[in-house]
Swiss-Prot record:
Gene Ontology biological process terms in this record: cell division; endosperm cellularization; mitotic sister chromatid segregation; mitotic spindle organization
Source domain of life: Eukaryota
Coiled-coil intervals, chain numbering: 142-239, 299-386
InterPro entries for the chain: Kinetochore_Nuf2_N (IPR005549), Nuf2_N_sf (IPR038275)
A Gene Ontology molecular function term of the record: microtubule binding
Function: Acts as a component of the essential kinetochore-associated NDC80 complex, which is required for chromosome segregation and spindle checkpoint activity to ensure proper cell division.
Similarity field: Belongs to the NUF2 family.
Subunit structure: Component of the NDC80 complex, which consists of NDC80, NUF2, SPC24 and SPC25.
Alphabetical UniProt keywords: Cell cycle, Cell division, Centromere, Chromosome, Coiled coil, Mitosis
Chief place of localization: nucleus
Native organism taxonomy: Eukaryota, Viridiplantae, Streptophyta, Embryophyta, Tracheophyta
Name of the gene encoding the protein in the UniProt record: NUF2
Disruption-associated phenotype: Embryonic lethality due to division arrest before the globular stage.
Protein name: Kinetochore protein NUF2 homolog
Length: 440
């Protein structure tokens, strides 16, 4: 027995179940006195509801099997009925239905047996719907996870593309960066040298400024001494008349002092000009240093931009690693859902194998039934031949005596009735036999 049971539903329950499932709209009269057409249509709709029969297969017949018959047009309806019977029988056998169905249940259905078979199929449908309701959230969740996996894969692909572009940009700019780093190193060395030179020049400039200040003081002092000398010279001129000899000596002494003062003044002027030239050189060097400093500032800005790009690249790598972790967790969930789907597929394959085994058993029984029908058909042919010979004998004996004729006519009528019954049975067996041929 399967996981579900076969409680016989009442007619009202069957009507309600068929209506709720939108299979068919039936009445109690239809179930109380079922007809062959009603039962065939109801079984067809139930099989379509259970996915055991496609909507397109409804009313179709096996034309290849019909071509093997002498009059295929006479067997189209019987072929459809036999095909439906095989489908219903396979389904009930798959459900381990305790009550076997026969072809008679389609041709001349009984109310109790029909209700039992419909109850079994509807119970299976309810059982299947309940299981599908349990599986449906998992399937929807699996679909959402698959969609999220696709989105993550697209996002990872986009990030990989961006990383590839960044890697290409890094490789493309690597020679320039290396050259820039070399230039920066050279400029740093040059800046260090210029800073040292600037410190040295500042110290020298400070010394020269102090020396210039000292020379200015000396020049001022020399000018002051010159003024005093001029005043003394004027005094000496006024005193020449009074003491020329003494004045001449003092004058010569003053001339010597004045000569030394002029020499000191000339020397101070030369030193001042040299200091001015050195100061001009310092100013030019300072301008060059300022220009180099501006270039260095631009280079530092480029280096800062390169470092910013590198930080962004590292941030993208970290983000990619986080997305990779999320993707791995999502992939683990997808693997788990795929494992569940594989288990369901394995269960479905097992059911299909069991169905194939049942179908083989049914085919074997059908072959045996075919042999039996063939033997009965031959027996009926023999009987028909015998009947024809008897009729001929009766016709011959009719001319002899009226009594024999009357008894012969009665016997012929009796044999004719029996013959019609035999022909009718023969026709039913022929229809059944022809209906089994497509599945061979």
């Amino acid at each position: 027995m399967s996981a579900y049971e076969y409680p016989r539903l009442s007619r009202s329950d069957i009507i309600t179940a068929l209506k709720d499932a939108q299979i068919a709209s039936v009445t109690e009269t239809d179930l109380k006195t079922p007809t062959s057409d009603f039962v065939s249509e109801l079984y067809t709709r139930i099989l379509i509801y259970l996915d055991a029969l496609d909507e397109e297969e409804k009313g179709q017949v096996d034309f290849e099997a019909l071509e093997q018959l002498e009059n295929p047009d006479h067997h189209a309806t019987s072929m459809q009925a036999m095909k439906l019977y095989c489908k219903v029988k396979d389904m009930l056998e798959m459900l381990d239905c305790p009550l076997p169905i026969s072809f008679k249940d389609l041709l001349r259905p009984e109310s109790s047996r029909t209700e039992f078979f419909i109850s079994a199929l509807l119970n299976y449908g309810l059982y299947k719907d309940s299981k599908m309701d349990l599986i449906r959230p998992k399937a929807e969740e699996l679909g959402l996870l698959d969609e999220q996996r696709k989105q993550c894969e697209a996002k990872v692909a986009q990030l990989n593309a961006e990383i590839g572009e960044f890697d290409e940009a890094v490789e493309r700019d690597l020679p320039f960066v290396q050259e820039l780093e070399a230039n920066i190193e050279q400029l740093n060395k040059k800046i260090l040298e210029l800073n040292n030179q600037q410190m040295s020049l500042r110290a020298t400039f400070q010394k020269m400024r102090e020396k210039s200040t000292q020379m200015d003081n000396e020049i001022s002092k020399a000018e002051f001494d010159l003024v005093e000398t001029v005043q003394e010279n004027a005094n000496l001129r006024s005193q020449i008349v009074q003491s020329p000899d003494k004045l001449q000596g003092a004058l010569e002494e003053k001339k010597l002092v004045l000569g030394e003062t002029k020499k000191a003044e000339q020397s101070a002027m030369v030193t001042f000009q040299e200091k001015a030239a050195i100061l001009e050189v310092f100013e030019k060097a300072l301008k060059k240093i300022l220009k180099s400093s501006s270039q260095l500032q631009l280079i530092n800005e480029q280096v800062t931009n390169a470092k910013t790009v590198e930080k962004e690249f590292k941030a993208l790598k970290d983000k990619l690693s986080e997305d990779g972790v999320a993707y791995k967790s999502l992939e683990a969930k997808v693997v788990e859902r795929e494992r569940i789907v594989e288990q369901l597929n394995e269960s479905l394959k097992q059911l299909e194998k069991e169905k194939a085994v049942m179908f083989d058993d049914w085919t074997k029984q059908l072959n045996e039934l075919k042999v039996e029908v063939e033997s009965r058909r031959r027996e009926l042919e023999t009987r028909q031949t015998n009947v024809e010979s008897v009729v001929a004998m009766v016709d011959d004996n009719t001319a002899k005596t009226n009594q024999v004729r009357q008894s012969g006519e009665a016997k012929v009528k009796k044999l004719a009735a029996k013959y019609e019954e035999i022909v009718k049975q023969f026709h039913e067996y022929t229809v059944s036999f022809d209906a089994f041929l497509p599945s061979l």
